[in-house]
């Protein structure tokens, strides 16, 4: 997703004290892409595979013919019911890169550790991370709820770092590296959810240049994370949004 430049809307509106309020419109993107499928990478064209799992056994063992199987493009996929029953899987336990789906765990830790009206201040590290962003600037201040919107709707890497710094300091007030503290908590939370094939190395999912590493997950683990995230009212409301405005107090 290309980097966004989000113009100021409220410079013409006078605000309290000397702060200028800025409203940033967030383009819908990542929220619509979240599903219980980790299709990384997608195969060229849809495929029907009799080796796919159907309720615990492969389709060929169940004598299910190709015309009765789903025709999907994903290399790795899983269909899980609300009760955790797995109805369908393709390479569901294969460890793959999940990119911005990483932000689901970032959101989980945020809603579990924060009140939605807490204030988050955007650091230089957050504002300059680049790639897909919510257009946050160094010194900006916004609520946790607004930062979650910046995280999930345009898949904002800036919001991911800002939240990781904020939550990391709450988890360990004495930490000298709040992001590292947050990432450690991400991995611990994943294990508690039963995610056996997941390793996080940052809060946004970037995996090149200074962010290159061995982060990975599986379609099955992504399903477990999504199942947990969807229990939260705020998360459900945010990912259901097609468009959103966030109000930011500029430095």
Where is each model-derived feature located?
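N-terminal targeting leaders characterized by basic, low-complexity, disordered sequences
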Residues: 1-9
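Preference for long, amphipathic alpha-helical scaffolds in soluble/luminal domains
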Residues: 3-4, 19, 23, 47
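Bacterial N-terminal signal peptides that target proteins for export
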Residues: 9-30
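C-terminal segment of classical bacterial N-terminal signal peptides
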Residues: 34-43
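A generic structural signal for nonpolar/aromatic side chains embedded in well-ordered alpha-helices
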Residues: 36, 151, 238-239
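Active-site-adjacent loops and short helices of periplasmic peptidoglycan-processing enzymes
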Residues: 46-220, 230-233
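Extracytoplasmic
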Residues: 226-251
């Amino acid at each position: 997703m290309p980097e966004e430049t989000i113009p100021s809307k409220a410079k013409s509106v006078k605000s309290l004290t000397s702060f200028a309020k800025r409203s940033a419109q967030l383009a819908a993107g990542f929220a619509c892409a979240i599903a219980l499928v980790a299709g990384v990478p997608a195969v060229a064209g849809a495929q029907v595979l009799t080796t796919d799992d159907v309720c615990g056994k492969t389709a060929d063992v169940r004598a299910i013919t190709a015309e009765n199987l789903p025709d999907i493009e994903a290399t790795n996929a899983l269909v899980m019911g609300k009760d955790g029953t797995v109805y369908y899987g393709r390479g569901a336990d294969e460890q793959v890169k999940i990119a911005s789906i990483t932000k689901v765990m970032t959101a989980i830790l945020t809603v579990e550790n924060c009140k939605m009206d807490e204030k988050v201040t955007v650091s230089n590290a957050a504002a300059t991370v680049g790639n897909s962003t919510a257009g946050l600037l160094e010194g900006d201040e916004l609520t946790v709820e607004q930062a979650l919107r910046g995280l999930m709707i345009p898949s904002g890497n800036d919001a991911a770092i800002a939240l990781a710094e904020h939550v990391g300091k709450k988890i360990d007030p004495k930490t000298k590296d709040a992001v590292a503290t947050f990432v450690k908590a991400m991995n611990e939370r994943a294990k508690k959810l039963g995610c056996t094939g997941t390793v996080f190395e940052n809060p946004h999912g970037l995996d090149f240049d200074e962010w290159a590493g061995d982060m990975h997950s599986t379609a099955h683990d992504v399903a477990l994370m999504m199942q947990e995230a969807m229990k939260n009212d705020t998360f459900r409301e945010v990912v259901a949004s097609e468009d959103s405005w966030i109000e930011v107090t500029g430095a």
